[in-house]
Structures are given as C-alpha cells and as structure tokens.
C-alpha cells in the first residue's frame, strides 16, 4: 500500500519563481502593463483590470497557478519602475510583501518595513533619511496567546477563557489571584463576596462546601437577608445571590471551577460577580442630545447607538444587581461636549436625564482653551488640541458626580477613544473601545498622502489617536467581522492599521493584530419600541399620518422639502443619512437619474442634509450643491422628493412603515459603512433593504434572502438590481413579502439590544478578571504608548489650529 509523503509548503517567492520560469512571457506582459502606468499605487481592482487586458491565452495559463493566486490576493501594487511591489493578503489578517524587477524578472521578499520604505519613495523619493521612527507593538504581544484560525477573529473572550482557565486553576498556588480578586470587591466601602475571614484557597473551599451543605437544607426561595449573618460569620458577604437557590447556584459554579475548570463555567461564574455599578461612556464631538439634533453636522447614528445602548445596559445592570441580592443604584453617564451656543437644543445644559431610564444621564463638559470656554461647535476633525484639558475636566466632573471611580469606561469614535484611554490610564479602570468608523479606510490613500488631507482633516492626528487607543484598551467591540478583518477580498478597518506609513512622521510596521483576543463582535440592534414591523397594525402611530403625508406628497416646496411626486401610486425607494461624501446619497440620486426604467417603476425619496439652516460643514455644502445640480441635469422633479433631515425618531419609525405600505425599499448606498444602523432599522420594520457591500451591511444582510448587497462603485449595476426586484414584485407581489419576512427574521435572530447589553457586561467581567489575575494589563506596551503620546500625538494635536470664536 502506497504511503502518503508529507512535503514542505513552498514559500510565496518560491512558487512565484517556479511560475516565472514556466510562464515568463505571459507574466512579463502583465508586469509591463503595470510598469507602463508609471510611478504610483494601483488598487486591487486596477491590477485585475490590467490582467483582464492581456491576451486570453496568456490569462488562462496564469489563472490557475501561483501567479493567479498572488493576483487574486494582491491588495495594492506599488509601481516605481523598474520595480513593482505587491502587498499580498492570502487570507484576512495574513500579509506577505514582495517586489519584482520587471526588466530582470527577479522576485524579492520584503519585510513590512522594507515594503513601507519602498512605498514612501512615491512621496519622498529616495531621500527620506536612514532613520525613521518605526512603531512595532508585536514584541509586547509575542509571549501572549493568540488564535490563528479566522473563525476565532472577533471571538476573543472565548479564546481567552479556553486558554487561561486551565492555566489558572492547575494547582492550589495558582488559586491565590482568584481569591484576591473575589476579596477586592466592594462598593463605597462595603465589602462584597468575601471578607477577611477567608485567608487562603483551602479555607475558601471549606467554607463553600459548608455553605452548600446548609443551603441544600432550606427553602430555595429563602431571601438572602435571612441567612446573611450566618454567612458573614464564615466569611461570605452579599453578592452571591438574592435567594438561597441563586446563592447555591453561584457557590456550586465556583466549586465546579475549582475542581475541574472549563471556559463555560468560568464565564458563567464571572457573569454573577457584582463588578459593574458605574459606567462612563464618552462621545465628545457633535451635538449630543435626545431631541432635534439628528442631521446636525457630525450628529447621526452614533448618538442613536449610544442612547439605545444605555437604555438596554441599565435594564441589564438593574436585573443583575437584583439577582446578586444587592440594593445598589447603578449610574451610567454619557460624557459629551457642552455647547453654550447650541440654540434650540439641550446641548448647553450640563446634566440631562436619558428618556426611558432611571439612572442614566448625559453629562456635558465644555472644551476650554487659554481664553476660557469654547462656545461654538467644532468639527470632529478639529477637536484634537482640546482633548487633553478636556480629559482632566471630565475626571474632575466624574469625581463630583459619582463620588467614586467608574467600573467601566467606554470610548466612542477617535476622540472619545483617546479621552477614554487617558481616563482609564489615570483611574486604573477597565476600558472598552468602539470605533464606529475608522477614517483611514473611508479615505483611500489618506495615510501615504496624508499631507494632502492635513489642512482639512488633520488625519495625522486622528490616525495617531486611533493607533494609541486601540493598543491601550482592554477590549474592543465591533459590530461586524468586516470591521476587524474585512472579507476574503476587502481589508478590514482595524486590519488596515496592521502596517502603514505616514511619510515624514513615522512608519507602523506592526500596529494591530486582528487575531488579538481583545477583539469581540457585539452587534447592536434597533429600538424595538420604535422600529417594529409594519404588519403590527395595532401599534401603528396613525397620529403621524398627516405629517408624513405632508412630507412625502405635498405639492408645496419649501425649506423642508423640494420637488414633488406626481404619481403617488408608485412604490418609493427611500434613503435616510447624513449628507456627506461617504454616505453617497448623491450617488444614489445619480444612479436613479440615469436609469429610465427605474424611474418608470418607482419614486425616489431622500432624507438628508438640513436645508432649513446654513451649513458650516464643508462636505455637506459640497454635497448640497451637487444635489441641486443632479435635480436640474436629470429633470427629477415629479419623481423625486428631497426632504431635510428629520429628527423625530419615533415619527421616522412610522415613516419606514409608510414606505412599506407603498411596497417600496430602503437603499443604503454608502461608499463604506462600518455597521449600518439604518439598515437594521429598515429591516426591523419589514422594509426590503439594498445596502452597500463595503462594511457591516454585508454581514447584516444575507443576499437574496433578507435583502440585497450593492456595490457603490458600480451604480449602474445597483440600479439594475433595483429594477429587477421591482419588476419581479410587479409580476409576483409575494416576492416583496418574502424579502420583507427574511429581513425581519434576520433581525430577531442577530440584532437586538438585549443580546448586546448582556455581552457587554459579560466582557467587562471577563476582561476585568483576566486583567487582575494575569499579565493582560500589558504594562510594557502602556509605557511604550506613554512615550508615543508625549513625543508624537501631543505635538500633532498642538499643530491643529484652535477654533476662532
């Protein structure tokens, strides 16, 4: 019987060398085309386009070999004749770099630093000096466990529990950190869980068995207060549960853990420990309020996300605290900027209670400079010089408001995350990072050509802040896998920070590892009290119908709505977003304008921008100008309605349902969308949804079942897909119902705030525990980060001009 032989896996360079030998002329034909493009960067789609141009016979020879594999995995090609360097990504999170001399057909492997140095020559030529600051965070994580399978990306807490639970409980000595962890729990001076009568692991196990024996003999519903003194005498304090049954379950979980540790038992036990009473959520930029702000500059989905988040979080915290047998009142504070001049909003009010909660408040702290309080709104791209002082002011306000340290600090977006990092560092508190959107992926080549963007966007500062925060934080939550590591063909937002360069500033040879167990996918949901299915007629908000009728169909044109819909019997394609370049609303209008068949089948209604006031946002101004041009160019009046941004979320929920009544669809055409909250909202009402395949919506929607993916770079195809859908619905109305039901089912299974809040509190407990009992605190990297902050970030922040009052 023949035996199989194990053979060595050849490197990428070796396989390419073999292909070069076998197909020299064919490869030369392609490389010559790339070289002929001249000095510059070619993206994946451009490389493939050039490959498609070589003769078919040559393409066939290369497609199935190593060279075809390289081409399919190439994310970018750097052309500096006679060299072509390739950044090859065989799978998410794995990168290889090489370059080929087109004239000599010689292949060289490159280290990340060598590739980046080669890339820098596009900007600086070869005279960029011998010494460039290189950032490399890999040495700090080299000894730390990390998964290697793609399915582990975004499941950091599961990996961490598996790896470390066995390590922690392997002998009696290793139990001391757990004992200390249980003993340190207290609230405002009152001891929880264990008191000082329990001094070592042996006495802990003895006491637990004694307690188990006693609890087995009493009524499971017995309140904790009836045996509280008995337990205090043996070393157990409040926090184990509110009834005998619940306390017994907690004690048995810990006994099981001490005897035969496993990750599920560990997570279940940590879930029961009272750890989180005070939560601070940071979101400095924009107009953060509950009423009449959506649609203002820098004010959109993030505000909605946080307000929904805190309602669900408070509910879960209250439930857990009650089950733990405690009478503690939790606090959640949303920290944002106080805007004295934000007339018509509550943004000038220091403290504002969050609707639908008992103990959540918005706490506003102003920006200050040497002259005093900064009164006017400042773009999110220009907040950097204020944030260090702001952090100190926030720390002072928190001490006054909470009378203790928070248990969890959550940062949002770049500015919130760097403030969260500085606060967590100062207070020694568990930190969670939520990016929402990393600007580096939204603006192609904004790293290598950062100087072109600097005056308007100050990306050097923002990318530095992002890098600092993602490496400082204890754990990162993302809404999707794509946010971390992209897809087979597209690079993830965090992944794009693996290796990059800001020529003249610094070179990042290892910025973040997408396999790092700090990454966890925790998807948000839509507020189910607002976004419920259109079929639930008894819940429909009929009182809004006259207002919605006016918005959609009135023949009046004014500051709130322009253009009219002549045929109100047609279905409506609907979209709602901020009016900026990335949201690509004008792109959708252009696709519609160009497609005669689509215009014949449906009307288009856009809710974006605020025409009722003069915008200060440069992108919004440019997009408004473009929109007026499109209306004129394509003669859209009669089939198109442009409505100014609508700030009443409850009415917006009914607006989605009215669009359902027309048998219409929702379209989210963004160039890139980190998550896609409006996608979830639309689907939650039963509205068939077409959304960008770049980012989160690619995961939210299962194409053809719960909605459809569209490519914003191929608007003609997106328009054709819409035509195909509406023609199919015209022939068979049940097709609309099928996609509508598919969307509703998808939301129920995956995207609810209840699931989200449970996961967030679980993660806080687990990472807080591991931070205490292991080296997860990453002290070495934090010292490195302190230096990076002081020597690089601070100077960059100081270079951003202060706002003129």
UniProtKB/Swiss-Prot annotation:
Catalysis: reaction(s): an NDP-alpha-D-glucose + D-fructose = a ribonucleoside 5'-diphosphate + sucrose + H(+)
Gene Ontology terms for molecular function: sucrose synthase activity
InterPro entries (alphabetical): Glyco_trans_1 (IPR001296), Sucrose_synth_GT-B1 (IPR000368), Sucrose_synthase_pln/cyn (IPR012820), SUS_EPBD (IPR056736), SUS_N (IPR056735)
Keyword Kinase: no
GO biological process, one term: sucrose metabolic process
Transmembrane stretches, start-end: none
GT-B glycosyltransferase: annotated segments: 275-752
EC number: 2.4.1.13
Keywords annotated in UniProt: Glycosyltransferase, Transferase
Keyword Glycosyltransferase in record: yes
Family: Belongs to the glycosyltransferase 1 family. Plant sucrose synthase subfamily.
NCBIfam families (UniProt xref): sucr_synth
Role of this protein: Sucrose-cleaving enzyme that provides UDP-glucose and fructose for various metabolic pathways.
Protein name stated in the entry: Sucrose synthase
Organism expressing this protein natively: Medicago sativa (Alfalfa)
């Amino acid at each position: 019987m023949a035996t199989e032989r194990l053979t060595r896996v050849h490197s990428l360079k070796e396989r390419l060398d073999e292909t070069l030998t076998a197909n020299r002329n064919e490869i030369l034909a392609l490389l010559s085309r790339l070289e002929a493009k001249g000095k510059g960067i070619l993206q994946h789609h451009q490389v493939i386009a050039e490959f498609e141009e070589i003769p078919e016979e040559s393409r066939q020879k290369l497609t199935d070999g190593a060279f075809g594999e390289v081409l399919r995995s190439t994310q970018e090609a750097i052309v500096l004749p006679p060299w072509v360097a390739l950044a090859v990504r065989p799978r998410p999170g794995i990168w290889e770099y090489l370059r080929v001399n087109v004239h000599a057909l010689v292949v060289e492997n490159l280290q990340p630093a060598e590739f980046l140095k080669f890339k820098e020559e596009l900007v600086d030529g070869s005279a960029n000096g011998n010494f460039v600051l290189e950032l490399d965070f890999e040495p700090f994580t080299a000894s730390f466990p990390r998964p290697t399978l793609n399915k582990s990306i975004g499941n950091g807490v599961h990996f961490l529990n598996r790896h470390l639970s066995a390590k922690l409980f392997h002998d009696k000595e290793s139990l001391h950190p757990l004992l200390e962890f249980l003993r340190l729990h207290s609230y405002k001076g009152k001891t929880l869980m264990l008191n000082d009568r329990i001094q070592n692991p042996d006495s802990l196990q003895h006491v637990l068995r004694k307690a188990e024996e006693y609890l087995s003999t009493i009524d499971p519903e017995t309140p904790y207060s009836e045996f509280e003194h008995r337990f205090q005498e043996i070393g157990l304090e409040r926090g184990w549960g509110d009834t005998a049954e619940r306390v017994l379950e907690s004690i048995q979980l810990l006994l099981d853990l001490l005897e035969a540790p496993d990750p599920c038992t560990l997570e279940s036990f940590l879930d029961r420990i009272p750890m989180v009473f005070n939560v601070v959520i940071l979101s400095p930029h924009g107009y953060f309020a509950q009423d009449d702000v959506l649609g203002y500059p820098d004010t959109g989905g993030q505000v909605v996300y946080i307000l929904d988040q805190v309602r669900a979080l408070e509910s879960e915290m209250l439930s857990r605290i009650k089950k733990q047998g405690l009478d503690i009142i939790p606090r959640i504070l949303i920290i944002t900027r106080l805007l004295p001049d934000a007339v018509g909003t509550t943004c000038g009010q220091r403290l504002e209670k969050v609707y639908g909660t008992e103990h959540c408040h918005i706490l506003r702290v102003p920006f200050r400079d040497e002259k005093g309080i900064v009164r006017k709104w400042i773009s999110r791209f220009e907040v950097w010089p204020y944030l260090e002082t702001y952090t100190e002011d926030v720390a002072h306000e928190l001490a006054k408001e909470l009378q203790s340290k928070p248990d969890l600090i959550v940062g949002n977006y770049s500015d919130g995350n760097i403030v969260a990092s500085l606060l967590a560092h100062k207070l020694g508190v568990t930190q969670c990072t939520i990016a929402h959107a990393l600007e580096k992926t939204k603006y192609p080549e904004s790293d290598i050509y950062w100087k072109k963007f600097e005056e308007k966007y100050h990306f050097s500062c923002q990318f530095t802040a992002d890098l600092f925060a993602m490496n400082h934080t204890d754990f990162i939550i993302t809404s999707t896998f794509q946010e971390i590591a992209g897809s087979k063909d597209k690079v993830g937002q965090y992944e794009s920070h693996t290796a990059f360069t800001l020529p003249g500033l610094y070179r990042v040879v290892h910025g973040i590892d997408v396999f790092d167990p700090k990454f966890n996918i925790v998807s948000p949901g839509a507020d189910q009290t607002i976004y419920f299915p259109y079929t639930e007629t008894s819940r429909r908000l009929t009182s809004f119908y006259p207002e919605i009728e006016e918005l959609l169909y009135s023949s009046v044109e004014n500051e709130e709505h322009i253009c009219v819909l002549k045929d109100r019997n047609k279905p409506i394609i609907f979209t709602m977003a901020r009016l900026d370049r990335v949201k690509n609303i004008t792109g959708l209008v252009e696709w519609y304008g160009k497609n005669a068949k689509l215009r014949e089948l449906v009307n288009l209604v856009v809710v974006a921008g605020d025409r009722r006031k003069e915008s200060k946002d440069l992108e919004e101004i440019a997009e408004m100008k473009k929109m007026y041009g499109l209306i004129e160019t394509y003669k859209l009046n009669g089939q198109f309605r442009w409505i100014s941004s609508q700030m009443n979320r409850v009415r917006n929920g009914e607006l989605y349902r009215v669009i359902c009544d027309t048998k219409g669809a929702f379209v989210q055409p963004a160039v890139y969308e980190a998550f896609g909250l409006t996608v979830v909202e639309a689907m939650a009402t039963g509205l068939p949804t077409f959304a960008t395949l770049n980012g989160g919506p690619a995961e939210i929607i299962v194409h053809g079942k719960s909605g459809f993916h569209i490519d914003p770079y191929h608007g003609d195809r997106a328009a054709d897909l819409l035509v195909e859908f509406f023609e199919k619905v015209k022939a068979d109305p049940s097709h609309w119902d099928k996609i509508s039901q598919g969307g509703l089912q998808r939301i129920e299974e995956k995207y609810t705030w209840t699931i989200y809040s449970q996961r967030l509190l679980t993660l806080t407990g687990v990472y807080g525990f591991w931070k205490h009992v292991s080296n997860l605190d990453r002290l070495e990297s934090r010292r490195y980060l302190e230096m990076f902050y002081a020597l690089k970030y601070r100077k960059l922040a100081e270079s951003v001009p202060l706002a003129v009052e």
